[in-house]
Swiss-Prot record:
<comment type="similarity">
    <text>Belongs to the UppP family.</text>
</comment>
<feature type="transmembrane region" description="Helical">
    <location>
        <begin position="4"/>
        <end position="24"/>
    </location>
</feature>
<feature type="transmembrane region" description="Helical">
    <location>
        <begin position="43"/>
        <end position="63"/>
    </location>
</feature>
<dbReference type="GO" id="GO:0005886">
    <property type="term" value="C:plasma membrane"/>
</dbReference>
<feature type="transmembrane region" description="Helical">
    <location>
        <begin position="144"/>
        <end position="164"/>
    </location>
</feature>
<protein>
    <recommendedName>
        <fullName>Undecaprenyl-diphosphatase</fullName>
        <ecNumber>3.6.1.27</ecNumber>
    </recommendedName>
</protein>
<keyword id="KW-1133">Transmembrane helix</keyword>
<dbReference type="InterPro" id="IPR003824">
    <property type="entry name" value="UppP"/>
</dbReference>
<keyword id="KW-0133">Cell shape</keyword>
<feature type="transmembrane region" description="Helical">
    <location>
        <begin position="109"/>
        <end position="129"/>
    </location>
</feature>
<keyword id="KW-0472">Membrane</keyword>
<keyword id="KW-0812">Transmembrane</keyword>
<keyword id="KW-0378">Hydrolase</keyword>
<dbReference type="GO" id="GO:0008360">
    <property type="term" value="P:regulation of cell shape"/>
</dbReference>
<feature type="transmembrane region" description="Helical">
    <location>
        <begin position="185"/>
        <end position="205"/>
    </location>
</feature>
<dbReference type="Pfam" id="PF02673">
    <property type="entry name" value="BacA"/>
</dbReference>
<comment type="function">
    <text>Catalyzes the dephosphorylation of undecaprenyl diphosphate (UPP). Confers resistance to bacitracin.</text>
</comment>
Protein backbone atom coordinates (compact mmCIF):
# COMPACT_ATOMS: atom_id res chain seq x y z
CA UNK A 1 0.00 0.00 0.00
CA UNK A 2 1.41 3.47 0.76
CA UNK A 3 4.49 3.88 2.93
CA UNK A 4 3.82 7.39 4.19
CA UNK A 5 0.98 8.58 6.42
CA UNK A 6 1.24 11.96 4.71
CA UNK A 7 0.71 10.29 1.32
CA UNK A 8 -2.47 8.59 2.57
CA UNK A 9 -3.80 11.88 3.95
CA UNK A 10 -2.96 13.82 0.79
CA UNK A 11 -4.55 11.24 -1.51
CA UNK A 12 -7.69 11.06 0.67
CA UNK A 13 -8.06 14.84 0.55
CA UNK A 14 -7.34 14.89 -3.18
CA UNK A 15 -10.04 12.28 -3.87
CA UNK A 16 -12.58 14.08 -1.69
CA UNK A 17 -11.89 17.45 -3.32
CA UNK A 18 -11.79 16.30 -6.95
CA UNK A 19 -14.38 13.49 -7.19
CA UNK A 20 -17.40 15.70 -7.81
CA UNK A 21 -15.93 18.88 -9.26
CA UNK A 22 -15.19 18.81 -13.02
CA UNK A 23 -11.40 18.47 -12.81
CA UNK A 24 -10.95 14.65 -12.94
CA UNK A 25 -10.25 12.84 -9.68
CA UNK A 26 -8.69 9.91 -11.54
CA UNK A 27 -6.41 12.23 -13.48
CA UNK A 28 -5.30 13.98 -10.30
CA UNK A 29 -4.63 10.67 -8.52
CA UNK A 30 -2.56 9.43 -11.48
CA UNK A 31 -0.50 12.63 -11.52
CA UNK A 32 -0.17 12.76 -7.72
CA UNK A 33 0.92 9.13 -7.45
CA UNK A 34 3.45 9.70 -10.22
CA UNK A 35 4.78 12.75 -8.35
CA UNK A 36 4.81 10.97 -4.97
CA UNK A 37 6.16 7.71 -6.36
CA UNK A 38 3.10 5.88 -5.01
CA UNK A 39 1.84 3.60 -7.75
CA UNK A 40 1.30 -0.08 -8.41
CA UNK A 41 -1.34 -2.76 -7.82
CA UNK A 42 -1.81 -1.96 -4.12
CA UNK A 43 -2.08 1.71 -4.92
CA UNK A 44 -4.91 0.90 -7.35
CA UNK A 45 -6.78 -0.93 -4.57
CA UNK A 46 -6.40 2.08 -2.27
CA UNK A 47 -7.69 4.47 -4.95
CA UNK A 48 -10.76 2.30 -5.55
CA UNK A 49 -11.78 2.15 -1.90
CA UNK A 50 -11.32 5.84 -1.08
CA UNK A 51 -13.76 6.59 -3.91
CA UNK A 52 -16.43 4.93 -1.77
CA UNK A 53 -15.87 7.61 0.86
CA UNK A 54 -16.72 10.31 -1.67
CA UNK A 55 -19.80 8.38 -2.84
CA UNK A 56 -21.02 8.03 0.74
CA UNK A 57 -20.70 11.82 1.11
CA UNK A 58 -23.28 12.37 -1.66
CA UNK A 59 -25.69 9.89 -0.07
CA UNK A 60 -25.38 11.61 3.32
CA UNK A 61 -25.61 15.14 1.85
CA UNK A 62 -28.82 14.35 -0.07
CA UNK A 63 -30.21 11.81 2.40
CA UNK A 64 -33.45 13.74 3.06
CA UNK A 65 -34.16 14.14 -0.65
CA UNK A 66 -33.51 10.46 -1.33
CA UNK A 67 -35.83 9.53 1.53
CA UNK A 68 -38.61 11.74 0.11
CA UNK A 69 -38.13 10.21 -3.34
CA UNK A 70 -38.35 6.70 -1.86
CA UNK A 71 -41.60 7.66 -0.09
CA UNK A 72 -42.89 9.16 -3.33
CA UNK A 73 -42.32 5.88 -5.17
CA UNK A 74 -44.65 4.09 -2.76
CA UNK A 75 -47.17 6.90 -3.12
CA UNK A 76 -46.99 6.64 -6.94
CA UNK A 77 -45.55 10.15 -7.26
CA UNK A 78 -44.85 10.98 -10.92
CA UNK A 79 -41.97 13.24 -9.88
CA UNK A 80 -40.26 10.45 -7.92
CA UNK A 81 -40.66 7.95 -10.75
CA UNK A 82 -39.24 10.46 -13.25
CA UNK A 83 -36.24 10.94 -10.96
CA UNK A 84 -35.55 7.19 -10.89
CA UNK A 85 -36.15 6.91 -14.64
CA UNK A 86 -33.58 9.61 -15.35
CA UNK A 87 -30.97 8.00 -13.10
CA UNK A 88 -31.46 4.69 -14.93
CA UNK A 89 -31.41 6.38 -18.36
CA UNK A 90 -28.11 8.05 -17.49
CA UNK A 91 -26.65 4.92 -15.89
CA UNK A 92 -27.44 2.20 -18.45
CA UNK A 93 -25.52 3.69 -21.45
CA UNK A 94 -22.45 4.04 -19.23
CA UNK A 95 -22.66 0.39 -18.17
CA UNK A 96 -23.03 -0.84 -21.75
CA UNK A 97 -20.22 1.26 -23.22
CA UNK A 98 -18.03 0.67 -20.17
CA UNK A 99 -18.42 -3.10 -20.40
CA UNK A 100 -17.38 -3.02 -24.05
CA UNK A 101 -14.58 -0.45 -24.06
CA UNK A 102 -13.31 0.22 -20.52
CA UNK A 103 -10.31 -2.11 -20.44
CA UNK A 104 -9.18 -1.19 -23.95
CA UNK A 105 -9.36 2.53 -23.20
CA UNK A 106 -7.65 2.08 -19.83
CA UNK A 107 -4.78 0.09 -21.33
CA UNK A 108 -4.23 2.62 -24.10
CA UNK A 109 -4.79 5.90 -22.32
CA UNK A 110 -4.07 5.60 -18.59
CA UNK A 111 -0.86 7.58 -18.88
CA UNK A 112 0.12 10.85 -17.16
CA UNK A 113 0.66 12.65 -20.48
CA UNK A 114 -2.85 11.73 -21.65
CA UNK A 115 -4.20 13.13 -18.38
CA UNK A 116 -2.34 16.43 -18.88
CA UNK A 117 -3.68 16.85 -22.42
CA UNK A 118 -7.25 15.88 -21.42
CA UNK A 119 -7.20 18.37 -18.53
CA UNK A 120 -6.15 21.19 -20.86
CA UNK A 121 -8.54 20.36 -23.72
CA UNK A 122 -11.40 19.75 -21.28
CA UNK A 123 -10.79 23.14 -19.69
CA UNK A 124 -11.06 24.91 -23.05
CA UNK A 125 -14.26 23.02 -23.88
CA UNK A 126 -15.71 23.86 -20.46
CA UNK A 127 -15.06 27.59 -20.93
CA UNK A 128 -16.83 27.59 -24.30
CA UNK A 129 -19.83 25.48 -23.23
CA UNK A 130 -20.38 27.39 -19.98
CA UNK A 131 -20.22 30.72 -21.82
CA UNK A 132 -22.60 29.64 -24.58
CA UNK A 133 -25.19 27.87 -22.43
CA UNK A 134 -28.20 30.08 -21.74
CA UNK A 135 -32.00 29.93 -21.45
CA UNK A 136 -32.15 26.47 -19.81
CA UNK A 137 -35.26 24.39 -20.44
CA UNK A 138 -34.93 22.01 -17.49
CA UNK A 139 -34.52 23.21 -13.91
CA UNK A 140 -34.88 19.98 -11.93
CA UNK A 141 -33.68 16.40 -12.34
CA UNK A 142 -37.29 15.22 -12.55
CA UNK A 143 -38.03 17.58 -15.46
CA UNK A 144 -35.28 16.18 -17.70
CA UNK A 145 -36.79 14.23 -20.63
CA UNK A 146 -35.69 10.60 -20.91
CA UNK A 147 -33.86 11.13 -24.21
CA UNK A 148 -31.75 13.90 -22.68
CA UNK A 149 -30.90 11.65 -19.73
CA UNK A 150 -29.68 8.98 -22.16
CA UNK A 151 -27.52 11.53 -23.98
CA UNK A 152 -26.00 12.70 -20.68
CA UNK A 153 -25.25 9.05 -19.93
CA UNK A 154 -23.46 8.73 -23.26
CA UNK A 155 -21.49 11.91 -22.54
CA UNK A 156 -20.47 10.36 -19.23
CA UNK A 157 -18.71 7.59 -21.16
CA UNK A 158 -16.04 10.11 -22.20
CA UNK A 159 -14.82 9.91 -18.60
CA UNK A 160 -13.21 6.56 -19.43
CA UNK A 161 -10.41 8.74 -20.80
CA UNK A 162 -8.30 9.70 -17.76
CA UNK A 163 -8.31 13.45 -17.24
CA UNK A 164 -11.68 14.08 -18.90
CA UNK A 165 -13.63 13.96 -15.59
CA UNK A 166 -16.87 12.06 -15.10
CA UNK A 167 -18.59 15.05 -13.50
CA UNK A 168 -17.19 17.36 -16.18
CA UNK A 169 -18.48 15.17 -19.01
CA UNK A 170 -21.96 14.82 -17.51
CA UNK A 171 -22.30 18.48 -16.52
CA UNK A 172 -21.09 19.83 -19.86
CA UNK A 173 -23.29 17.32 -21.70
CA UNK A 174 -26.27 18.46 -19.63
CA UNK A 175 -25.54 22.15 -20.28
CA UNK A 176 -25.41 21.50 -24.02
CA UNK A 177 -28.87 19.90 -23.76
CA UNK A 178 -30.49 22.91 -22.05
CA UNK A 179 -30.29 21.80 -18.42
CA UNK A 180 -29.49 24.59 -15.96
CA UNK A 181 -26.20 24.71 -14.03
CA UNK A 182 -27.42 23.63 -10.61
CA UNK A 183 -29.59 20.82 -11.99
CA UNK A 184 -26.75 19.62 -14.23
CA UNK A 185 -24.44 19.57 -11.22
CA UNK A 186 -26.87 17.71 -8.97
CA UNK A 187 -27.72 15.25 -11.74
CA UNK A 188 -24.00 14.54 -12.06
CA UNK A 189 -23.83 13.92 -8.29
CA UNK A 190 -26.77 11.51 -8.41
CA UNK A 191 -25.44 9.63 -11.44
CA UNK A 192 -22.15 9.17 -9.59
CA UNK A 193 -23.77 6.87 -7.03
CA UNK A 194 -24.74 3.90 -9.27
CA UNK A 195 -21.88 4.48 -11.73
CA UNK A 196 -19.14 4.66 -9.11
CA UNK A 197 -20.62 1.84 -7.03
CA UNK A 198 -20.72 -0.43 -10.08
CA UNK A 199 -17.17 0.54 -11.10
CA UNK A 200 -15.90 0.07 -7.54
CA UNK A 201 -17.45 -3.39 -7.15
CA UNK A 202 -15.97 -4.42 -10.49
CA UNK A 203 -12.51 -3.07 -9.65
CA UNK A 204 -12.56 -4.55 -6.14
CA UNK A 205 -13.29 -7.97 -7.59
CA UNK A 206 -10.45 -7.63 -10.08
CA UNK A 207 -8.08 -6.33 -7.38
CA UNK A 208 -9.20 -8.79 -4.67
CA UNK A 209 -5.80 -10.53 -4.56
CA UNK A 210 -4.09 -7.22 -3.79
CA UNK A 211 -6.25 -6.49 -0.74
CA UNK A 212 -4.78 -7.55 2.62
CA UNK A 213 -6.04 -7.23 6.19
CA UNK A 214 -2.78 -5.49 7.12
CA UNK A 215 -3.80 -2.58 4.86
CA UNK A 216 -7.15 -2.06 6.61
CA UNK A 217 -5.91 0.86 8.75
CA UNK A 218 -4.52 2.80 5.79
CA UNK A 219 -7.62 2.15 3.70
CA UNK A 220 -9.94 3.22 6.54
CA UNK A 221 -8.02 6.45 7.08
CA UNK A 222 -8.12 7.31 3.37
CA UNK A 223 -11.84 6.45 3.26
CA UNK A 224 -12.73 8.72 6.20
CA UNK A 225 -10.62 11.62 4.93
CA UNK A 226 -12.17 11.32 1.46
CA UNK A 227 -15.70 11.22 2.95
CA UNK A 228 -15.27 14.29 5.18
CA UNK A 229 -13.53 16.30 2.46
CA UNK A 230 -16.16 15.45 -0.18
CA UNK A 231 -18.99 16.38 2.21
CA UNK A 232 -17.52 19.87 2.58
CA UNK A 233 -16.69 20.26 -1.12
CA UNK A 234 -20.19 19.33 -2.38
CA UNK A 235 -21.77 22.31 -0.60
CA UNK A 236 -19.02 24.73 -1.64
CA UNK A 237 -19.13 23.52 -5.24
CA UNK A 238 -22.88 24.14 -5.54
CA UNK A 239 -22.44 27.67 -4.17
CA UNK A 240 -19.61 28.48 -6.60
CA UNK A 241 -21.50 27.08 -9.60
CA UNK A 242 -24.64 29.04 -8.74
CA UNK A 243 -22.75 32.32 -8.37
CA UNK A 244 -19.86 32.09 -10.84
CA UNK A 245 -20.49 29.18 -13.18
CA UNK A 246 -17.77 26.73 -14.22
CA UNK A 247 -15.12 29.20 -15.42
CA UNK A 248 -12.96 28.89 -12.25
CA UNK A 249 -12.74 25.12 -12.75
CA UNK A 250 -12.08 25.49 -16.47
CA UNK A 251 -9.13 27.81 -15.84
CA UNK A 252 -7.84 25.49 -13.13
CA UNK A 253 -7.90 22.57 -15.60
CA UNK A 254 -6.08 24.62 -18.23
CA UNK A 255 -3.33 25.71 -15.82
CA UNK A 256 -2.86 22.27 -14.23
CA UNK A 257 -2.87 20.64 -17.66
CA UNK A 258 -0.16 22.97 -18.93
CA UNK A 259 1.96 22.58 -15.78
CA UNK A 260 1.63 18.79 -15.85
CA UNK A 261 2.44 18.69 -19.57
CA UNK A 262 5.61 20.76 -19.06
CA UNK A 263 6.66 18.70 -16.03
CA UNK A 264 6.18 15.39 -17.84
CA UNK A 265 7.82 16.66 -21.02
CA UNK A 266 11.02 17.70 -19.25
CA UNK A 267 11.12 14.91 -16.66
Amino acid sequence: MHDSLLTIILLGILEGVTEFIPVSSTGHLILAERLLGAHGANSASFDIIIQLGAILAVIVFYWERFLNIAKGLFQHSTSSWHFVRNILCGFIPTVIVGAIAYHAVKALLEKPMVVAIALFVGGIAMLIIDRESSHPENTSVQSIPAHKAVLVGLAQCLAMIPGVSRSGATIMGALCLGIDRKTATEYSFFLAIPVMLAATVKELWEQRHNLHIADFGEISLGFVISFVTALIVIKLFLEIVTRRGFAPFAWYRIIIGLVAFAFLLFN
